[in-house]
Amino acid sequence: MAKLDFDRSKPHVNIGTIGHVDHGKTTLTAAIATVLAKKGLAEARDYASIDNAPEEKARGITINTSHIEYQTEKRHYAHVDCPGHADYVKNMITGAAQMDGAILVVAATDGPMPQTREHILLARQVGVPKIVVFLNKIDMFKDDEREEMVGLVEMDVRSLLSEYGFDGDNAPIIAGSALKALQGDPEYEKGILELMDAVDTYIEEPKRETDKPFLMAVEDVFTITGRGTVATGRVERGVLQLNEEVEIVGLKPTKKTVVTGIEMFRKNLKEAQAGDNAGLLLRGIDRSEVERGQVLAKPKTIVPHTQFEATVYVLKKEEGGRHTPFFHNYKPQFYFRTTDVTGGIEFKPGREMVVPGDNVELTVTLIAPIAIEEGTKFSIREGGRTVGAGSVTKILK
């Protein structure tokens, strides 16, 4: 079958399904694609094609993820669904699939379960802004008890969302049956369309990366005789015009400079923007004053820090991680953007050790200041291999 041409004039939004194992995340993902396919807005998908998720690597970690795309009348969506619970944890912490919003799937027959809670907490920690809820499997109730049971589960879900800092009072909650919709039952197909209307209106369009303040991590530095020092790297966000000021942040005291040349693939440019691999010529900066691991950023938009709280996933032995637990004062390398910095780890009170496979909250103290902010992603490495992945949740100093 020919691939659909997606209409790029529609705003693009990244979403994903989250929730407890067997509550119907993958069935719902298939149902959304299948129902929208009837309007010519998606390719119909069956459960197996989504469940059989390909392996991906992000920050040295293997993750199984299914990506599907579809449209509504208003938007173009990229939707991520993970087969296993550990895949969700890894995916969200590494930022492999950024989510602008999530659809939380809760089986109305069970109500919220342990992973429901864990996924909501993870969504909060990694900065997913909005959650829409789908109460699944309502076809399992007898007609006369359905309304009451759905109402009870809805109350539980709202209080759980509020507990973790989401807007439990106003989050849209749609009840339905993903399986019945996937099988083509018109009554239940309506529920899927209602869900997508809620996603269209409640989940906000993300700010484009180009609208954010300029930031580029330095990968390499060299000197051009007679012209000066050039720093190269990939622009993470924002736009930089020729002759604008930037700050060199991290590892050393922050310095200001002016970008007097922007080069990409040996061509001179007037600006560099998010996604570009660029070389920036820095006025009055000596080769020794800028190094890999620093960032070039719009002045006063990012500051170097040495201490922060983070949520971290520690790889299992089978994933290439450590074979043994680690304890207080473990001092691995923290890999931010383009460089490793040694840091010490402290646990939350009451925890003695961290075992491979754990998802844990830690306090980290780096030996050198690095340009970081809430939401910055990092890997934890030991002897050059990745043993964990994390996301900064709170800056301490």
Curated annotation (Swiss-Prot):
<keyword id="KW-0342">GTP-binding</keyword>
<feature type="region of interest" description="G1">
    <location>
        <begin position="19"/>
        <end position="26"/>
    </location>
</feature>
<protein>
    <recommendedName>
        <fullName>Elongation factor Tu</fullName>
        <ecNumber>3.6.5.3</ecNumber>
    </recommendedName>
</protein>
<feature type="region of interest" description="G5">
    <location>
        <begin position="177"/>
        <end position="179"/>
    </location>
</feature>
<feature type="binding site">
    <location>
        <begin position="136"/>
        <end position="139"/>
    </location>
    <ligand>
        <name>GTP</name>
    </ligand>
</feature>
<dbReference type="GO" id="GO:0005829">
    <property type="term" value="C:cytosol"/>
</dbReference>
<dbReference type="Pfam" id="PF03143">
    <property type="entry name" value="GTP_EFTU_D3"/>
</dbReference>
<comment type="function">
    <text>GTP hydrolase that promotes the GTP-dependent binding of aminoacyl-tRNA to the A-site of ribosomes during protein biosynthesis.</text>
</comment>
<keyword id="KW-0648">Protein biosynthesis</keyword>
<dbReference type="InterPro" id="IPR009000">
    <property type="entry name" value="Transl_B-barrel_sf"/>
</dbReference>
<feature type="binding site">
    <location>
        <begin position="81"/>
        <end position="85"/>
    </location>
    <ligand>
        <name>GTP</name>
    </ligand>
</feature>
<keyword id="KW-0963">Cytoplasm</keyword>
<feature type="binding site">
    <location>
        <position position="26"/>
    </location>
    <ligand>
        <name>Mg(2+)</name>
    </ligand>
</feature>
<feature type="region of interest" description="G2">
    <location>
        <begin position="60"/>
        <end position="64"/>
    </location>
</feature>
<comment type="subunit">
    <text>Monomer.</text>
</comment>
<dbReference type="GO" id="GO:0005525">
    <property type="term" value="F:GTP binding"/>
</dbReference>
<dbReference type="InterPro" id="IPR041709">
    <property type="entry name" value="EF-Tu_GTP-bd"/>
</dbReference>
<dbReference type="InterPro" id="IPR033720">
    <property type="entry name" value="EFTU_2"/>
</dbReference>
<dbReference type="GO" id="GO:0003746">
    <property type="term" value="F:translation elongation factor activity"/>
</dbReference>
<keyword id="KW-0479">Metal-binding</keyword>
<dbReference type="InterPro" id="IPR004541">
    <property type="entry name" value="Transl_elong_EFTu/EF1A_bac/org"/>
</dbReference>
<keyword id="KW-0378">Hydrolase</keyword>
<feature type="domain" description="tr-type G">
    <location>
        <begin position="10"/>
        <end position="207"/>
    </location>
</feature>
<keyword id="KW-0547">Nucleotide-binding</keyword>
<comment type="similarity">
    <text>Belongs to the TRAFAC class translation factor GTPase superfamily. Classic translation factor GTPase family. EF-Tu/EF-1A subfamily.</text>
</comment>
<dbReference type="InterPro" id="IPR000795">
    <property type="entry name" value="T_Tr_GTP-bd_dom"/>
</dbReference>
<dbReference type="InterPro" id="IPR050055">
    <property type="entry name" value="EF-Tu_GTPase"/>
</dbReference>
<dbReference type="InterPro" id="IPR005225">
    <property type="entry name" value="Small_GTP-bd"/>
</dbReference>
<feature type="region of interest" description="G3">
    <location>
        <begin position="81"/>
        <end position="84"/>
    </location>
</feature>
<dbReference type="InterPro" id="IPR031157">
    <property type="entry name" value="G_TR_CS"/>
</dbReference>
<feature type="binding site">
    <location>
        <begin position="19"/>
        <end position="26"/>
    </location>
    <ligand>
        <name>GTP</name>
    </ligand>
</feature>
<dbReference type="InterPro" id="IPR027417">
    <property type="entry name" value="P-loop_NTPase"/>
</dbReference>
<keyword id="KW-0460">Magnesium</keyword>
<dbReference type="InterPro" id="IPR004160">
    <property type="entry name" value="Transl_elong_EFTu/EF1A_C"/>
</dbReference>
<dbReference type="GO" id="GO:0003924">
    <property type="term" value="F:GTPase activity"/>
</dbReference>
<dbReference type="InterPro" id="IPR009001">
    <property type="entry name" value="Transl_elong_EF1A/Init_IF2_C"/>
</dbReference>
<dbReference type="Pfam" id="PF03144">
    <property type="entry name" value="GTP_EFTU_D2"/>
</dbReference>
<feature type="region of interest" description="G4">
    <location>
        <begin position="136"/>
        <end position="139"/>
    </location>
</feature>
<dbReference type="Pfam" id="PF00009">
    <property type="entry name" value="GTP_EFTU"/>
</dbReference>
<dbReference type="InterPro" id="IPR004161">
    <property type="entry name" value="EFTu-like_2"/>
</dbReference>
<keyword id="KW-0251">Elongation factor</keyword>
